[in-house]
Every structure is written in structure tokens, then in C-alpha cells.
Design a protein with these regions (language model features):
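C-terminal helical subdomain
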Residues: 181-182, 186, 199-248
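Conserved Rossmann-fold cofactor-binding substructure of NAD(P)-dependent oxidoreductases
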Residues: 65-80
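N-terminal Rossmann NAD(P)H-binding glycine-rich loop of SDR-like oxidoreductase domains
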Residues: 14, 18-23
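Hydrophobic positions on the long internal alpha-helix
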Residues: 88, 122-126, 130, 171-172
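Rossmann-fold cofactor-recognition segment
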Residues: 50-68
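Catalytic loop of short-chain dehydrogenase/reductase
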Residues: 93, 97-112, 117, 131, ...
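Rossmann-fold scaffold of SDR-type NAD(P)-dependent oxidoreductases
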Residues: 11, 84-92, 115, 140-142, ...
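Conserved glycine-rich Rossmann-like NAD(P)H-binding loop of the short-chain dehydrogenase/reductase
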Residues: 26-45
């Protein structure tokens, strides 16, 4: 069974950018969204969207690095709609705002597990079903702070987060090189006023100087890039919310 709809899977969809992706995609015709959350029962806004768009928004339990759980979600998608066209790997953490000199190994491992390994596990689980889609887009939410060219000179102290984003950028580029029939790329959403960014601002004087855009603005802009993305214009590149190509 397949459908004429475009089918999306969004990780980290219970709040912030992920939730906004679900909101905007759910308003599109011929679109089905599977919204991943660690605790679907507690994701009140996602449940409300599911009730508003029955059969078109599905809330699923999706945890970073959970191989069996990720595979179960993809199998659920296969059984319900028979295809998976676009995955947006949005789930991430940023809960240790300090310079690298003071970062613990445990914090580095936690950020790497969720932000890097979790993204790879999601791709591995989604791959068999995505392979059958003519669209085959796997989009990673990246960050300019993880640019090796730009990030080290930023004055904000986002050590473990930035390092993990640099690593997941490489994962995306390498996956594109290894999978020629996919469109795979990271995209920076810009500074966005999410709970995660506001929390980081409260612990970093430099970040506090830079107010974020609304999630609605950022996601609408990113969707324009994602919609128009091809292997030639975006695959294996570090895209920006503006549509420009960022430096690695």
C-alpha cells in the first residue's frame, strides 16, 4: 500500500522547531505527518494537532539512539501509509552552556549520543522505507555554531552542542556521498526563540545579545529550502535558512 500524499517523519516534534514543522505541514493538502516525541501521552499540542487532523497527523514514540524503537516507528509508517518521503532529524539537546575547558566527558558523550548517534540511528531505521520513495529527502537540523570555519570564533560558550553539530554535519555529508539516490543535507535554522535557545541565552551573556526569530518564521523559511532541495542544489551541502550555502 502506498499513498499519493507526501509522508513526513519529524523527530523531536513535541516542542520548538519540531512542533512548528508539524503545525505547518499539517495545514498542507495531501500531506501526512508522523510526529516523533519521547513521551507522546505528555505531548499535548501534538495530540491536539492529531485530533484536529485525524489520519494526517500521527503522534509516535521516538527516542534518540533507540534502534528498536526507531525501527518500530518506521514499521508503523509502512503499515499505515506504505511510504516515507521526507525525514527531518530535528531531535537534539543543548543543556551544557560553557567553554570546552570546563566541559565534562559525560556531557560531551550525552550530546554526541543524542545529536549525532541518534541522527544516524534514525537514518538507518528509515532507509529501507525511504529507498522506495521517489523523493528520499533526509534533512538534519544543523547549526552555524557547528561550522568549523565559523563556529570557533563565536563568543557564545556552546561547547558540547557545537562540537556535536560539527559531527552531525559530517554524518549528513557522508551519508549523501554514500547514497547517491537520496537528497541529504544539514540546514541551519538560524537563531530561533525556542525553549532550548532561551535556556541557553539565560546562561550565556553573548547569546543574550541576540534575540531569536519566531519558530514560525524559521520553519516556513526552511520548508521553502527543503521543498526545492535537489541533490544538485542542496545534497551534501550545509544549507542555511535563507537558502544560501553555509561554510562547513
Amino acid at each position: 500500500m502506498t499513498t499519493s500524499n507526501t509522508v513526513y517523519l519529524i523527530s523531536g516534534a513535541n516542542r520548538g522547531i519540531g512542533l512548528e514543522f508539524v503545525k505547518q505541514l499539517s495545514e498542507r493538502p495531501n500531506t501526512v505527518v508522523f510526529a516523533g516525541a519521547r513521551n507522546p501521552q505528555a505531548a499535548a499540542e501534538l495530540q491536539a494537532l492529531s485530533a484536529k487532523h485525524p489520519g494526517r497527523v500521527h503522534v509516535v514514540e521516538l527516542k534518540a539512539c533507540d534502534e528498536q524503537g526507531n525501527a518500530r516507528v518506521v514499521e508503523e509508517i509502512r503499515q499505515k501509509v506504505g511510504q516515507l518521503d521526507v525525514v527531518i532529524a530535528n531531535a537534539a539537546i543543548c543543556n551544557d552552556v560553557q567553554e570546552l575547558l570546563n566541559v565534562s566527558p559525560e556531557s560531551m558523550r550525552e550530546h554526541f549520543d543524542v545529536n549525532v548517534v541518534g541522527t544516524l540511528v534514525l537514518f538507518q531505521a528509515a532507509y529501507p522505507l525511504m529507498k522506495a520513495s521517489p523523493t528520499r529527502k533526509f534533512v538534519v537540523i544543523g547549526a552555524k555554531g557547528g561550522s568549523i570555519t565559523l563556529g570557533p570564533e563565536y563568543r557564545s560558550a556552546l561547547g558540547p552542542y557545537a562540537v556535536s553539530k560539527a559531527a552531525v554535519h559530517y554524518v549528513a555529508k557522508k551519508l549523501q556521498f554514500e547514497n547517491e539516490d537520496f537528497v541529504i543535507f544539514p540546514i541551519c535554522p538560524g537563531r530561533v526563540s525556542t525553549d532550548m535557545y532561551l535556556s541557553a541565552q539565560s546562561n550565556d551573556a553573548e547569546l543574550a545579545k541576540h534575540p531569536g526569530e519566531t519558530p514560525a518564521f524559521s520553519v516556513a523559511s526552511m520548508l521553502r529550502v527543503i521543498d526545492g532541495a535537489t541533490r544538485e542544489n542542496a545534497g551534501g551541502k550545509f544549507m542555511d535558512v535563507s537558502g544560501a550555502v553555509n561554510e562547513w
